[in-house]
Structures are given as structure tokens and as C-alpha cells.
Amino acid sequence: MRNAWQWLVVFLGAVASAAAAPFMVVVYNVENLFDADGRAAFEDYQPARYSRAHVLTKLQNVATLLAQFEGGRGPDVILFQEFEADATPGATAPDCDAILRRYAGVRIEEMLGAKFDDAVADLPAEALLLKAMADRGMTGYRVIVGENITAAGTTRALAQTCVVFTRFPVKAVRSHPTVDARAILEVKVEVDGAPLYLFNNHWKSGASDPVTEAVRVENAKTLRQRLSEILRADPNADVILGGDFNSHHNHKRRNPAMAVTGVNDVLGSQGNELAVRGTQRDLYNLWFELPVEERGSDAYRGEWGTLMQMMVTRGLYDYRGVQYVDDSFGVAKVAGLNVDAKGLPRRWTFEGPAGGGFSDHFPVYAKFLTVPDNRTDRWVALRRASVESAEPAEGRKVDFAAVDLERVAVRAEQVPADTSLRSDAYRGKIVRVEGTVGPGRRLTVSFLGEVYDVWSFDEALRERLRERFKAGETVRFYGELGQFRDRWQFVIPDESWVK
């Protein structure tokens, strides 16, 4: 357990045995990376809101963040979620190497600008990102795209898919259809002659919903069945499971009313690092590498979540083939890039002529290496083996009181005359509000000539605000501007914002 970011910029020092250079695996939900063909299943990604300039911003931001790894070289393996399932696919899969050769003398800015044509419009999102990364010196990737297939019982078509970028030779690929979720992408690579299985997941959304948990149970069964097949053939097979599981690492503990959870009960994710040496548990969840106060890749209603996950099998702790580097797991939060003023993921926004932001999830990462010993009877010596400690059942609260409101807030005098806050330019901004409370049960405030709802995801705080804010009175607070069901609102996440 250590500074979560240091592994990205400091070369790994002492390692357990003579081995090949450590390599990095990153898991990253990019929050809807769509291409530039002007066709999309989501309304927000139609040309009216998602122009070529937006595509370019999205690509450049993803590439910029990935360039923070390995001294600008980028990770050797990336498990991506939320790439657009190409709405205009060709008869054959695109040849990404050929695409890079074709556009070797053209930068991505030109491809989406003055040199944009039908051929560029026809390129899928993964090819565009590959080019944006190549322009920054991140090269040598093989690209594997999950098939847009689902299992029987799926209720609707899906617009996203999972994608893997890897520098290692690819030996086998399978897409496993599952109910109401993106196909689970299995990629078998070879690292210094050793086989390594990668499983890229994006399970059904709605982490706290018991109805959708039943679907995630089915997603877990799909993955568990294939994992069990591999481990029956070789109990010490090297397998990395990654992705957006739309479940927390301690999902069972956080949702005690759920009789069966997909990630813990069916898949078998758990936090006892030594247990995988035995025969009863074959998966270890890397979130347990971090102290409780550092666990969080995303946030919902003021609580940190751990939807982005990486799990490893027992084989990654032995001395054959690929080996996990102890305590190397972390969360990629880069100040000034993908972290907002509240310390949360700086999510994508359509605001302005070119959009901005990164994703509503922080990426997670871990280091691995290969060992030549070929011994499955010897285990990595752990500095401090993790256990499933008594973690609080509720999610860890976001520390909104720590936000420097004076520094980040938009003030009334900064808003140009005759300009409405009700626009993408101000959506998501923290605003210093001084206004008049409106009448009625719904708490509202009149500010700069317009009426806004005042809301908090903390129910107790909402009630206190209703008692404290009386109709006709002047109130002062900081609120995050947003929109819910076509109503504009200021969200007050913490009582310390009322001042």
C-alpha cells in the first residue's frame, strides 16, 4: 500500500526474481468514445451535439491520459469499455496497421479537420484512437474488438462494445454473449512465451438496483463458466479479469438485501490474498491492495464506488509465466487532467464548440512481469498480504467539505449580462448563489433572473434545507449546476456548502 500514482512515473525497482521488464495493464471506461460518421444510437452523439471537433477532443484527452503511463510509451495492455459498436461497419474488420500506414504523414487533427473525407468518416472509434495515440508516440498495438452479440433473453440492442489494445502477440480471441450486457471479450496473449488470458467486461448497469443485479448474476455466470473451464484444464493458469463490472468490490457487503450478487457470490471475487494459494478460492480482487480510504474509481450520490475492477487468478502469484507485482495496483488520478475540483472524475461534457473532460470513471492499473522458474509450487513473498477487513457496509463518502469553493466557484459578476446559466457552458460548474427562496413545497431559488431547483442527494440535508430556507428570504450557498428531467437545479452535496 503506497502512493497510488508513483508506479506510473517511477520505474519498478527491486523485483522478486530475474525477469523480463514489468509491463502495465490498464482498465479504462472512456465514457462513450464514438466515431465521426455522424450516425449513433445515442441522441447526444448525433452531429448536432457531437461534431468532429468533439471527437478530436475526446481522442486527444484519452491519449493524453494514457501517455502518463510508462514515461509516455503507454501501457502494454489496455482493456477499454464504452467504445461505440460501429454503426457503419464494413464487410471486413478494419486493418489497423494498414490504416496507420495510410495516414502516417497526416495527424489526427488534420484527419478530422481539413482532410476529413468519407474514408475518415468510415473509420471506427478504435482506429481513430489508435491514430491519436500513435501521433503521441504510443505505437505497436494490436487491436481486438468485441463482437456486438448478446445472449438469448436480451431486451434491447447495445450501442457499445469492449476493446483491447495490446503489444503482445494475440493467440486466440473469443466474444462470450451474455444477457443485456456487452459481450465479454476474451483475448489470449503470449508474454515472453507464456500464455496470459485477458477478460474484458462491461456488465449490466444499475449497481444498487436488485432488479438489474439479477442480470449481473447472469453476466457473472457467463464469465464464471469460461473461467472454470480454463482453471479445470490448468489450476494455475494466468488470468486477468478487468472492466466495468457495475458492481463494487464489496458488493455483497454494500447490498445486504441482495440474496445473490454476481461479482462476489457467483464469480467469487474476494479479498483474502493468501486464499488463492488453496483450492477453495481462485480469484483475488486487487481493490484490496489499497487502504479503504483510497478505494474509489467513480462516485454516485456522494459515495465512492469501485465499479472499475481488476481480479487475478492464483497463477499470477506463482513462479511460472506471468506474475503480479505485489502492491502495484492503483487508480489513475492525474491532477490537472482527469480530476475535477471536487476530486471526482472529470467526466465528458459537450460544452463549448469542442467539448471537454475525460470520463466518469478513473482508470485502474497494475504491474506484471514474467518469471523463468516454471514452478507452480512456489509463491510470491508478499510484503503484507491483504485480507477482507471489516469495511463499512455503506460506501465511503466523498469529502465535499475539502473543496476549495472560493477558488473554483463561478460568481454572479463573472456571468456576462444577458447570459443564461442554463447551457452546457455552465453545466457541472460550482456556482456561488445568492438569491431568493421561492414559494411551495419544492425548494427553489431565483438567481440571475431565473428559477432553479435546490436539491441534495443527502435526504437528511434536503429536509434541513427546507426547514432553513423560507420563502421570500435571501439565501447564500454554493451549488453544482445540473439538470434533471428538464429541470435545472443547484445540487448542494454537503452542509459546508451553505455559507
Language-model-derived ranges and their functions:
Residues 212-235:
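A long, amphipathic alpha-helix that forms part
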Residues 20-25, 34, 168-172, 181-205:
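Beta-strand-turn-beta hairpins that frame and shape the catalytic cleft
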Residues 31, 83-84, 202-204, 245-248, ...:
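Catalytic metal-binding/acid-base residues of hydrolase active sites
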Residues 24-27, 76-81, 142-144, 162-166, ...:
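Structural recognition of the beta-strand scaffold that forms the well-ordered cores
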Residues 128-136, 153-172, 302-321, 367-369:
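Conserved beta strand-loop-helix elements of the APE1-like EEP
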Residues 175, 179, 229-237, 247-414, ...:
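Metal-dependent phosphoester-hydrolase catalytic domains
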Residues 273, 385-499:
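OB-fold single-stranded nucleic acid-binding module
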Residues 18-159, 342, 351, 369-401, ...:
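N-terminal, active-site-proximal structural segment of metallo-dependent hydrolase catalytic domains
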